[in-house]
Amino acid sequence: MAKEVVYRGSARQRMMQGIEILARAAIPTLGATGPSVMIQHRADGLPPISTRDGVTVANSIVLKDRVANLGARLLRDVAGTMSREAGDGTTTAIVLARHIAREMFKSLAVGADPIALKRGIDRAVARVSEDIGARAWRGDKESVILGVAAVATKGEPGVGRLLLEALDAVGVHGAVSIELGQRREDLLDVVDGYRWEKGYLSPYFVTDRARELAELEDVYLLMTDREVVDFIDLVPLLEAVTEAGGSLLIAADRVHEKALAGLLLNHVRGVFKAVAVTAPGFGDKRPNRLLDLAALTGGRAVLEAQGDRLDRVTLADLGRVRRAVVSADDTALLGIPGTEASRARLEGLRLEAEQYRALKPGQGSATGRLHELEEIEARIVGLSGKSAVYRVGGVTDVEMKERMVRIENAYRSVVSALEEGVLPGGGVGFLGSMPVLAELEARDADEARGIGIVRSALTEPLRIIGENSGLSGEAVVAKVMDHANPGWGYDQESGSFCDLHARGIWDAAKVLRLALEKAASVAGTFLTTEAVVLEIPDTDAFAGFSAEWAAATREDPRV
């Protein structure tokens, strides 16, 4: 395919246009009370998306000018990386990247050496990152969670309370999932054991009529992706379980009517204590779910791919749990012992999830990556043995989906804050690093210019927050920097200047550090771009047309 090549100044100028367009769209979302951005849904007939999340805005923008779109793509990448690694700071990273790229562009226009310029920027960023870590405050868990969550959710204090409950229940690195709820208010469900959304196959399994639950004690667990066709295949196993004084929970791909009738007849008569449910997972994902469950309960998954047969299963193959509670909609296993094998699988899944999050846009199918990551996260929740489900409430679907994004960001921000500490929020956290840059000596004028670019970038988030509040950004920066208190800043909620640290308005130090590092990295890519190579799209309606192929398929390739 033919190529178009765009060189040097022209390439950088058009890329800079794309950076400016995307940044101007995302910048209103910076701050606790910033306005929202309305995005047309890509599917006709569906309501628009209202968001106050920078990465959502960034991902929605694709420009017609393909060179300008490459510039916008740089900011989409930095926002996506921030969202994956820190959960918050996506708009902050966009603001920093835009400022650094803009100042680089000006410096190159007056003849600055790009290598020395980048060296100065890299040295300054490394020094600021080190200083952020040194200044970070690691306070009590409750205060940090409530403060960081309030900032990340744009001022919703109730979210912080529920996140605190969730993390108290499952731990900082425990399994917390954020899901759309069915009510106006947010709800938190903490689940002990292993749970999946498949209930009993017949109401005749119910043992508690008042609550419509089937409850089993001292449970043996049969896990299989095979279909149970004949009740006779289960009889030896049921007899062995009964002799051992236990009950049997059958989690299978499907239980045929003939086998189900035999189970129900003996269960109702009290001959055996047994309940049949559909196994967790779907399709080709089910074997992995069953292997997880087997590792957790100390049993063995009976899998078709391994050539396993139901009539050869013994008591030693079954998993063990203290109690099973089965409703019409879901199955919960309680009192799971856990094993070394389950802990090893859990660590492996966490590593795999991090690898998926680290993938950049364009690496594989975006939809495929999302589905794989969701499946891995669901398996992590199951293997954790205890999980918290945060159900997001709202009046409309649009509101719930917009809040869900912010609450997911808040959760990841809280975890980041507990890992590396916090600094005053509202853009003030960066200002404390200005003195260390003043002490940084440059080797030449262009390196000094690079250090100066980072120094001026540190004030940019605060300036934008001031402008988003209807004030003069420069005046806000000047007033904050003139104050002796390093925690002094502008509180958008109250519309006043105050000690942000004392008021509990914080940003996670990890978020600030990553935002600056990622912004400088992507701006460095822009700085060192000397040429852009593009494919020239073929607009010929008959491109790739083959008469033989058309005749064989009787299809018009232009349709």
UniProtKB/Swiss-Prot annotation:
Q: Among the entry's GO cellular component annotations, what is one? A: cytoplasm
What keywords is this UniProt entry annotated with? ATP-binding, Chaperone, Cytoplasm, Isomerase, Nucleotide-binding
Tell me its family.
Answer: Belongs to the chaperonin (HSP60) family.
Subunit and partners: Forms a cylinder of 14 subunits composed of two heptameric rings stacked back-to-back. Interacts with the co-chaperonin GroES.
Primary enzyme class: isomerase
Is tRNA-binding among this UniProt entry's keywords?
A: no
Residues recorded as binding ATP, renumbered to this chain, are 88-92, 426, 507
Q: What is its main location?
A: cytoplasm
Q: What does this protein do?
A: Together with its co-chaperonin GroES, plays an essential role in assisting protein folding. The GroEL-GroES system forms a nano-cage that allows encapsulation of the non-native substrate proteins and provides a physical environment optimized to promote and accelerate protein folding.
Recorded catalytic activity of this chain's protein: ATP + H2O + a folded polypeptide = ADP + phosphate + an unfolded polypeptide
Task: List the EC numbers from the record.
Answer: 5.6.1.7
Subcellular localization is given as:
Cytoplasm
Source species: Methylococcus capsulatus (strain ATCC 33009 / NCIMB 11132 / Bath)
State the Pfam families in the record. Cpn60_TCP1
Which taxonomic lineage does the organism of this UniProt entry have?
A: Bacteria, Pseudomonadati, Pseudomonadota, Gammaproteobacteria, Methylococcales
Give one GO biological process term.
protein refolding
Which InterPro entries does this one have?
Answer: Cpn60/GroEL, Cpn60/GroEL/TCP-1, GroEL-like_apical_dom_sf, GROEL-like_equatorial_sf, TCP-1-like_intermed_sf
The entry's protein name is: Chaperonin GroEL 3
GO MF annotations, alphabetized = ATP binding; ATP-dependent protein folding chaperone; isomerase activity
